[in-house]
Amino acid sequence: MPEHHQYQFEFMGLLFNGTTMITTTIAMAIVVIITVIGCRKLAMRPTGLQNFIEWVVDFCRGIIKANMDWKVGGRFIVLAYALLFYVFVANMMGIPFELVTKEGHNVFWKSPTSDPVLTLTMAVFIVVLTHIYGIMVTGPSTYGKSWFTPKWFLFPFKVIEEGSNALTLGMRLFGNIYAKEILMLLLVSLGTTAVYWGIFAFVPLIVWQAFSIFIGSLQAYIFAMLAMVYMSHKVEQH
């Protein structure tokens, strides 16, 4: 299998992953464009893209209602929608093809969620956001007391729990998507080795691409669901 490297560049002494930045920007643009077009001409009887957008919003509403009261959780509908839709699009981006330069074997196209830096950054952002809303919704006093209930000596374990939540949330998404792309790259490399290997690799590649769609969809759901679970722990008094 040929060795491929992700495109990187240095700016002000810092090393940036250009591949992740490119694909992340494209994924965000896809989400924004589809949402804007779908909501541009709203109708009482939705059709086409508006129908799809409303279905995604209803699905996100179901995720929120499953974890917290709607009066509290209704404010997170946009967050849930953005997380679910973006992670889904990002997961799907590596399925059709991989764009590689011939000279340096630099990968310019992949699922951005196969980069642990991105997934862990998103996970940390979610965990930090839960604490911000925890203070805003329950108040500083109630939020502060929650760290020492039911017993004060559990405080260190709660700190560890917050760190593990961010770590597992990010690494779960990264691990599944990275494994998906590695196996797909192996099948493609096998298929291009020789004609007879291409015949044997074609069917498994098609099957794996279909299964990759399922994996990407499932991981997008899990990421959005866990984000709302963590949010409910902070904004609702248990």
Curated annotation (Swiss-Prot):
CDD domains: ATP-synt_Fo_a_6 (cd00310)
Gene3D superfamilies associated with the record: ATP synthase, F0 complex, subunit A
Record-annotated membrane-spanning stretches: 18-38, 76-96, 117-137, 173-193, 208-230
GO biological process: proton motive force-driven plasma membrane ATP synthesis
Gene Ontology molecular function: any one: proton-transporting ATP synthase activity, rotational mechanism
GO CC field: plasma membrane; proton-transporting ATP synthase complex
Superkingdom classification of source: Bacteria
Annotated compartments: Cell membrane
Keyword terms: ATP synthesis, Cell membrane, CF(0), Hydrogen ion transport, Ion transport, Membrane, Transmembrane, Transmembrane helix, Transport
PANTHER family, per the entry: ATP SYNTHASE SUBUNIT A, CHLOROPLASTIC
Entries under HAMAP family matching the protein: ATP_synth_a_bact
Family in the record: Belongs to the ATPase A chain family.
Protein name as catalogued: ATP synthase subunit a
Originating organism: Shouchella clausii (strain KSM-K16)
